[in-house]
């Protein structure tokens, strides 16, 4: 798989058609707190684990201390157990913690992806290949300086990648 860099516009990287990732639209704080309170113990543990990680990461960025090592967390559960709901709440909290006034909302801190369109839709995300404009032709695509710089700009804030339905 290679990145299809030609899908990136050479104009304005924040134009809606150039946006690689869906924005996380922050919900009303009362609704967010209420939804968080209604998580079961396992969901709350997972949310707190990720929120603590993101807080440590932000503190490291602000104080110039070493950034914590990346984490890989797998959430298991059968259909209807609230995995998609948990992913949406994690997205909300990551955005609330990391985003500062003046940040470009099209430069994400978190992205939600999945291998299938149905799973991506359930988490208000995108398929992995559409998120990163991956092509499956097998042809290698070289990256010129302008496109490389554009990708760096778009991905500079990225701290959390969610891949739903990962087996």
Model segments located where?
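Conserved ATP-binding/catalytic motifs of P-loop helicase motor domains
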Residues: 1-167
